[in-house]
C-alpha cells in the first residue's frame, strides 16, 4: 500500500519535513482556504502540488472536496454548487490528481465529546461518550424532539450528568461537538448549529438517499470521464445523531451505493475506525466484498465501552478492529489489481493517533498530532511487510 499522511496545509503544526521523516511518500490534503462550493482553480491546485513536490512528496489523495450543504438538502443554488464541483474534478484531473475522498454527512464531518481522553499510559485520545452527548442534545442544545430518541432511563442518566457539569464543562463539551474538528469545514455557535439542523427537517433517510443518488449521478460520470476515482467516507459515528439521517454506515448501505451508481469511478474510503464503531459491521467481510471499489484506506481502531454506544480511539493495532484481516484483504486486492495490469497502490494513512510523548507539550490538531500517527504508520508498515512475506511471497 502507498503510505500517506494527512496534512492540513501551511498552517498545520506538523511540517512537510516531519511527514517525509515519518516515512510517508504521499500526502493527503485539500485547499482548505477555498470556501465550500467554490471552484478550485488549476493555479491553486498546482501551487499546492508544487509545495509538496519541493519536499519530495506527491499529492496522492484529495481529502476532501467539501460538498456544500445546499447539495445535501437540495435547496438554494445546489445545481450551481454541483456544476462547480464538476469543474473542480476536471481541474484536479488536469493536474494529475486522481483520488478524491469526500463525505455526505449532514452538518458535521465527525463528532466527539472529549478531545483529551486520558489513556492508561498517559497519552490522550479522542472519545465519544454517549451519556455526555445525550446531555448536550437534551439539556444544552435542547433540540426539539430529542427526547423521542432516548428512553426514560437514558434521559435520567443524561440529566444526572448535566446537573454535575460546571459552566466551563458545558462550554468545553459544546465546543468539542459543534465548533468543527479538523476535517470539518464549518464551525457553529449553538444558534447557528440548530439552524443548520433545522434545514434537515422533513428529510428522511430515504429522501436523503435520493439527494445522494442525484449527486452521484451528476458527479460520477464526470469523474469516470476524466479518470478520477471518487471515494466516499462513511458516517462517523455510523448511526443517526441529532435527528440527522445517516446513509453510509453498513454493508447494506455500501451495496445500495454501488447499485445506485455502478460506474467504476464510484468507490469507497474504507475507514476502519468509523465502520468499526458498529458491532454489527464485519469489517473483513466488508473489505473483501467491496475490495474492487476501495480506493483509499483510513486505518485506525476504536474500542467500544460498557455503554456500547460510547467508544474511544484505541491503539492502531488494538481495539475492536481486526486490522490484520482488513490489511490482508486490502493487500489481496492490490495483488489482484496488479495481476490485471493495474499497478497503482491503495493509498492508506494512519488515521488519528494518540497525543503522546513530546506532543503532550504542544498545541496540536485533535487526533492529528505527529508522534501518535508516526507510531501508527510504523506499525502498519511492519504489519504489511509481515503479511507480504508470509502470504504473498513478496
Swiss-Prot record:
This protein's encoding gene: uxuA
GO MF annotation, one: manganese ion binding
Entry-linked Gene3D superfamilies: Divalent-metal-dependent TIM barrel enzymes
Recorded metabolic or biological pathway in which this protein acts: Carbohydrate metabolism; pentose and glucuronate interconversion
Purpose: Catalyzes the dehydration of D-mannonate.
UniProt protein name: Mannonate dehydratase
Keywords: Iron, Lyase, Manganese
Uppermost EC category: lyase
EC number: 4.2.1.8
Amino acid at each position: 500500500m502507498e503510505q500517506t499522511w494527512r496534512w492540513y496545509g501551511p498552517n498545520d503544526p506538523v511540517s512537510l519535513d516531519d511527514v517525509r521523516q515519518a516515512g510517508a511518500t504521499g500526502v493527503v490534503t485539500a485547499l482548505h482556504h477555498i470556501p465550500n462550493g467554490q471552484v478550485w482553480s488549476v493555479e491553486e491546485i498546482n501551487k499546492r502540488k508544487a509545495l509538496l513536490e519541493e519536499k519530495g512528496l506527491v499529492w496522492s489523495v484529495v481529502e476532501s472536496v467539501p460538498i456544500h450543504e445546499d447539495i445535501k438538502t437540495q435547496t438554494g443554488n445546489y445545481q450551481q454548487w454541483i456544476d462547480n464541483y464538476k469543474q473542480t474534478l476536471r481541474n484536479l484531473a488536469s493536474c494529475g490528481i486522481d483520488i478524491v475522498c469526500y463525505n455526505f454527512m449532514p452538518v458535521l464531518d465527525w463528532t466527539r465529546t472529549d478531545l483529551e481522553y486520558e489513556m492508561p499510559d498517559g497519552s490522550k485520545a479522542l472519545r465519544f461518550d454517549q451519556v455526555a452527548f445525550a446531555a448536550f442534545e437534551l439539556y444544552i442544545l435542547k433540540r426539539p424532539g430529542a427526547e423521542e430518541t432516548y428512553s426514560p432511563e437514558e434521559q435520567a442518566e443524561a440529566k444526572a450528568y448535566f446537573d454535575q457539569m460546571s459552566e466551563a464543562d458545558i462550554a468545553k463539551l459544546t465546543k468539542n461537538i459543534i465548533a468543527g474538528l479538523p476535517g470539518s469545514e464549518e464551525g457553529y455557535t449553538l444558534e447557528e448549529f440548530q439552524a443548520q439542523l433545522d434545514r434537515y427537517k422533513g428529510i428522511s433517510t430515504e429522501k436523503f438517499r435520493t439527494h445522494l443518488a442525484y449527486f452521484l449521478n451528476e458527479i460520477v460520470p464526470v469523474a469516470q470521464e476524466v479518470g478520477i476515482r471518487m471515494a466516499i467516507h462513511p458516517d462517523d459515528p455510523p448511526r443517526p445523531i441529532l435527528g440527522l439521517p445517516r446513509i453510509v454506515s453498513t454493508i447494506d448501505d455500501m451495496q445500495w451505493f454501488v447499485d445506485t451508481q455502478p460506474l467504476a469511478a464510484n468507490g469507497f474510503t474504507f475507514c476502519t475506525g468509523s465502520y468499526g464503531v458498529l458491532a454489527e459491521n464485519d469489517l473483513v467481510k466488508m473489505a473483501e466484498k467491496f475490495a474492487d471499489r476501495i480506493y483509499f484506506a483510513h486505518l485506525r481502531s476504536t474500542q467500544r465501552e460498557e455503554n456500547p454506544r460510547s467508544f474511544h480511539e484505541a491503539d492502531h493495532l488494538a481495539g475492536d478492529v481486526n486490522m490484520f484481516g482488513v490489511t490482508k484483504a486490502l493487500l489481496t486486492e492490490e495483488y489482484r489489481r496488479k495481476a490485471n495490469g493495474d499497478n497503482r497502490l491503495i493509498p492508506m494513512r494512519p488515521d488519528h493517533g494518540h497525543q503522546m510523548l513530546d506532543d503532550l507539550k504542544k498545541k496540536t490538531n485533535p487526533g492529528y498530532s505527529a508522534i501518535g500517527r508516526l507510531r501508527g504508520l510504523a506499525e502498519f508498515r511492519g504489519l504489511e511487510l509481515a503479511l507480504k512475506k508470509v502470504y504473498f511471497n513478496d
